[in-house]
Amino acid sequence: MSLKLTKEGAYGYVSVLISKSPNLALLLEIIESDSPIDIQTAISRGILGSEYSLFLQMKSIDDIDEAIYNFYKYYLENLIKYIPRPYDNFINCFIEVFDLDKVISMIFILEKQKLRSRYIISQIEPLIEYIVYSKKSIGNLPLYTVCLSANKGQTVLDVVKCFTKIYIDRVANTLHSISEVELIENSLKIFYLFSSLRSYRYILSCRMLKSTCNIEIKDFIKEMGMPTPIALLAIEKINKIYEHIKKDPTFALIHELKSIYEQLKSLLYSPYSFIDRLTYLLIHKFYESMFIRYLAMNKYSWR
């Protein structure tokens, strides 16, 4: 028996999920506050729902990371069951960002250990199999393993760029398939902006590890093949983020969300646009997961 809703029914369902989601602006205030609160207090004040109480049980950073990853992947994979085609494929591709972040973090950890580049690259394929594809068809694996050719002169950052471009192309292609049934311009613009800001985070991580990152963000974004107006907007926002974080990069995530927040909210102003509403929910949940992680780790003070 199919659980798929009609497009109209899915619009209402996603609207309810948005209304029940924590307020991102409020989470930002909590993280930045001189008197921050913990998850338990946030639940008791109604800022978070009772379902977030499971993060109170975690005893280590690894436990927290695994619990948050599983919580949000399950939430979004469960959403796919109810969303009609072709929107379900958009969700399926978008949520690979959770896996992408996880794999890229592991790549930088390997590089921090100052292992030879070819050795690092040889370790990435089993890493992808374990993290990304352990519950998926092996037929999907070549989509990303094409980045692991380990050509002479290939760097870890080259692999990261390749992963990122494949991800962006996959999601953009699903959006273009949706353009046959409704306008996608707003969602596509916000997705490209979101992806640009994530790319900047990857470059920041690379530089913080004192790795070889001989690339400017404008060149990185250009290589992603984004439309020029969106690329210029992304670079403008990234330059502003840099001015805020150049003395302390631990503020990067906060300023990343602040730089996209108003445009993200604008997706809710498109009357009867299901794809805009769905895109809002997916990006909201990604940033929400990041802030819940900070609360769960008691990382409240940013000063």
Where are these regions (language model features)?
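N-terminal domain-start signal
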Residues: M1-R303
